[in-house]
Amino acid sequence: MEEQLIPIQWKDDALVLLDQTLLPNEIVYESFKTAESVWDAIQVMKVRGAPAIGVSAAYGVYLGIKEFAESTEEGFMDEVRKVCTYLATSRPTAVNLFWALERMESVATDNIHLSISQLKNRLLEEAKEIHREDEEINRQIGEHALTLFHDGMGVLTHCNAGALATTKYGTATAPMYLAKEKGWDLKIYSDETRPRLQGSTLTALELQRAGIDVTVITDNMAAMVMSQGKIDAVIVGCDRVAANGDVANKIGTLGVSILAKYYNIPFYVAAPTPTIDLKTSTGKEIPIEERDASEVINRFGKYSAPKESKVYNPAFDVTPHENVTAIITEKGIVKAPFTENLKKLFQ
């Protein structure tokens, strides 16, 4: 088993990120010391995965205000709001981004009686706390998910909701790591996940390094492996869960959920509670990021379609709650009726 890759670290007053755009061929850690550089890292997907984006943005708030010289409370709060508003524009779909930024702004507001120097330190401590909490949340999700799994089962996952998308364990992969600790032998199938291939470049990489049995398949092989009886459960992460249980996740998740429903295979969604957005009634209200055409037709520096091709490249799709068997959170497993039961998590 190789050393686990660490996607997010705080070192020497800087955010240190594993550049995930270079995986699996290069392992490169890069330091970020400004809010602008953090914004860029999120936007170009050097860091990705809803929880990891939220943690990075929280550190980005501190980096954006740490050199701020304004001595008045009002001036400082204006700057905090400005930095939060700016970082919120990096990617629109992952609700953890907005949750983390709102939390940082609230901490500044609640502690406005402190000196400016103390406020800056308080914001850094809050970013570190968000970071610490994420690791514990992931383990709790894994423990709950493991009650739905058994030794020897075949599990399909899509995209990367692993340790590289969070801070440790991952969400959808958390039960895989915990199963390994128990001595179980799960057989994981990882969709490559077009167009950015997070399933093959990230999920397969981290599971392989952890000594977990993982097989890469192309996205259009999912129906085949299900029909062959190789899949006992599907588990995916998510970028946002609406109040009714609709789930926004990486493009292709919807198709996997439809296949799972057809073959009567449980379809589980691993979702930290910060990813659940009760302000969004249904999946129709979730903004879907569209990315550049080059990701589809010029992924590796050579065109795989005519250069002038029209390209539609949504980064996410929405899986209706009817296709979801259960949503697994750190607080427990939620089943239908989702509107009622998701609300109970926050009471």
UniProtKB/Swiss-Prot annotation:
<keyword id="KW-0119">Carbohydrate metabolism</keyword>
<feature type="binding site">
    <location>
        <position position="198"/>
    </location>
    <ligand>
        <name>substrate</name>
    </ligand>
</feature>
<dbReference type="InterPro" id="IPR005251">
    <property type="entry name" value="IF-M1Pi"/>
</dbReference>
<dbReference type="Pfam" id="PF01008">
    <property type="entry name" value="IF-2B"/>
</dbReference>
<dbReference type="InterPro" id="IPR011559">
    <property type="entry name" value="Initiation_fac_2B_a/b/d"/>
</dbReference>
<dbReference type="InterPro" id="IPR043679">
    <property type="entry name" value="Deoxyribose1P_isomerase_DrdI"/>
</dbReference>
<dbReference type="InterPro" id="IPR037171">
    <property type="entry name" value="NagB/RpiA_transferase-like"/>
</dbReference>
<protein>
    <recommendedName>
        <fullName>5-deoxyribose 1-phosphate isomerase</fullName>
        <ecNumber>5.3.1.-</ecNumber>
    </recommendedName>
</protein>
<feature type="active site" description="Proton donor">
    <location>
        <position position="239"/>
    </location>
</feature>
<feature type="binding site">
    <location>
        <position position="91"/>
    </location>
    <ligand>
        <name>substrate</name>
    </ligand>
</feature>
<dbReference type="InterPro" id="IPR042529">
    <property type="entry name" value="IF_2B-like_C"/>
</dbReference>
<feature type="binding site">
    <location>
        <begin position="249"/>
        <end position="250"/>
    </location>
    <ligand>
        <name>substrate</name>
    </ligand>
</feature>
<dbReference type="GO" id="GO:0046523">
    <property type="term" value="F:S-methyl-5-thioribose-1-phosphate isomerase activity"/>
</dbReference>
<dbReference type="GO" id="GO:0019323">
    <property type="term" value="P:pentose catabolic process"/>
</dbReference>
<feature type="binding site">
    <location>
        <begin position="48"/>
        <end position="50"/>
    </location>
    <ligand>
        <name>substrate</name>
    </ligand>
</feature>
<comment type="pathway">
    <text>Carbohydrate degradation.</text>
</comment>
<feature type="site" description="Transition state stabilizer">
    <location>
        <position position="159"/>
    </location>
</feature>
<comment type="function">
    <text>Catalyzes the isomerization of 5-deoxy-alpha-D-ribose 1-phosphate to 5-deoxy-D-ribulose 1-phosphate, as part of a 5-deoxyribose salvage pathway that recycles this toxic radical SAM enzyme by-product to mainstream metabolites.</text>
</comment>
<dbReference type="InterPro" id="IPR000649">
    <property type="entry name" value="IF-2B-related"/>
</dbReference>
<keyword id="KW-0413">Isomerase</keyword>
<comment type="similarity">
    <text>Belongs to the EIF-2B alpha/beta/delta subunits family. DrdI subfamily.</text>
</comment>
<dbReference type="InterPro" id="IPR027363">
    <property type="entry name" value="M1Pi_N"/>
</dbReference>
<dbReference type="GO" id="GO:0019509">
    <property type="term" value="P:L-methionine salvage from methylthioadenosine"/>
</dbReference>
